[in-house]
């Protein structure tokens, strides 16, 4: 610290006399600016600790003012030259990579950079390398630009593809997507409908139309029931099965359920009706099920329950046929209202 203060005082005195007095300090390196002040005084480290790219130590003992300024100028010139040289190497490589994909009309290097490099002692081989890099970039840059322009114009889509190296992968996807879009646009559109098996045979179609109402599984008119069949088989048929489930409690009315089954079998048709009702006089809850087989390819059924079988209703129809060239089964369901518990179970 004392040596630093002593050097500062001597520098100020030397600046006034236009001559610098010798500064002696063990293990220290001093650098004076043009005013005679101490710019750096770092013990044992010299100018390298101040950010200057020098490997030698600089010790100033007794120099004149003109020599002092000349030395400082040379020091900063050497330091700036080192940093500029490294930056120029980085920029040269970066420019070489960029020039590979730029237009060939761009100038490879400016005149100022070439003069600076020659003044800084550039070797003759570096110039030859730059020329080779430029020729390489000129060749492949032209090829890439021509190929990208041909691919963008030949795709036939409204999407344009750039010719930069960063977007080269995206350009490939662009061309692939355009080709795929064109291929998909040329594909035909097919519409397949379910064809019931009973409608494919004209004789069977006429037979079915004579015994049932016009109901087609491929239409959206809904599920219909045969008009020729009676609504209640008990009007013309005796029950096939009757069962009663009864529970009796003390001092209470008997409770239970009654089940009645009716069937009607004909040549190619079968109809079944099931009725379940409560035996309690005050309870009017009933369940009514009606299922019929129209032919060997179609069956339908309805299920009603609630008060006098009028609260809830579900209708279904099952038909076999073909979908395109494959055998298939079509199932239709219709309901007006169902309990919330049934909806939760279905979900």
Swiss-Prot record:
State whether keyword Glycoprotein applies: yes
Q: Which GO terms describe its molecular function?
A: lipid transporter activity; nutrient reservoir activity
Q: Which residues form the signal peptide?
A: 1-15
- Where is there biased composition of kind Basic and acidic residues? 124-133, 164-174
Q: What is this protein called?
A: Vitellogenin-3
Source domain of life is Eukaryota
Give the tissue specificity. Answer: Produced by the liver, secreted into the blood and then sequestered by receptor mediated endocytosis into growing oocytes, where it is generally cleaved, giving rise to the respective yolk components.
Region (Disordered) location: 104-174, 200-234
Could you tell me which species this protein originates from?
Gallus gallus
Extent of Low complexity compositional bias: 104-118, 144-163, 209-219
Q: Which Gene3D superfamilies match?
A: Lipovitellin, beta-sheet shell regions, chain A, Vitellinogen, beta-sheet shell domain
Supply the alphabetized keyword list: Disulfide bond, Glycoprotein, Phosphoprotein, Signal, Storage protein
Known glycosylation sites: 80, 208
A Pfam family name for this chain? Vitellogenin_N
SMART domains of this UniProt entry? DUF1944
């Amino acid at each position: 610290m004392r040596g630093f203060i002593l050097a500062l005082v001597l520098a100020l005195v030397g600046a006034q006399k236009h001559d610098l007095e010798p500064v002696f300090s063990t293990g220290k390196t001093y650098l004076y600016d043009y005013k005679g002040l101490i710019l750096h005084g770092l013990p044992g480290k010299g100018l390298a600790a101040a950010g200057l790219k020098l490997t030698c130590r600089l010790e100033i003992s007794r120099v004149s003012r003109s020599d002092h300024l000349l030395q400082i100028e040379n020091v900063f010139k050497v330091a700036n030259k080192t940093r500029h040289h490294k930056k120029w190497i980085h920029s040269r490589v970066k420019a070489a990579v960029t020039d590979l994909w730029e237009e060939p009309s761009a100038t490879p290097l400016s005149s100022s950079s070439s003069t600076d490099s020659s003044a800084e002692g550039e070797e003759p081989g570096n110039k030859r390398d730059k020329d080779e890099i430029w020729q390489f970039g000129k060749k492949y840059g032209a090829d890439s630009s021509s190929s990208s322009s041909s691919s963008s114009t030949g795709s036939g889509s409204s999407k344009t593809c750039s010719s930069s190296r960063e977007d080269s992968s995206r350009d490939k996807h662009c061309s692939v997507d355009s080709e795929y879009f064109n291929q998909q646009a040329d594909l035909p559109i097919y519409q397949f409908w379910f064809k019931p098996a009973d409608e494919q045979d004209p004789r069977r179609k006429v037979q079915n139309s004579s015994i049932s109402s016009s109901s087609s599984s491929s239409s959206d008119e809904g599920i219909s029931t045969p008009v020729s069949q009676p609504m209640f088989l008990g009007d013309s048929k005796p029950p096939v099965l009757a069962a009663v489930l009864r529970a009796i409690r003390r001092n209470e009315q008997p409770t239970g359920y009654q089940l009645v089954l009716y069937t009607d079998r004909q040549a190619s048709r079968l109809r079944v009706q099931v009725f379940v009702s409560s035996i309690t006089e005050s309870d009017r809850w009933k369940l009514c099920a009606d299922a019929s087989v129209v032919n060997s390819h179609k069956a339908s059924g309805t299920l009603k329950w609630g008060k006098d079988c009028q609260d809830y209703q579900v209708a279904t129809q099952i038909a076999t046929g073909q979908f395109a060239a494959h055998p298939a089964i079509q199932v239709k369901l219709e309901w007006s209202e169902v309990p919330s518990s049934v909806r939760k179970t279905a979900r």
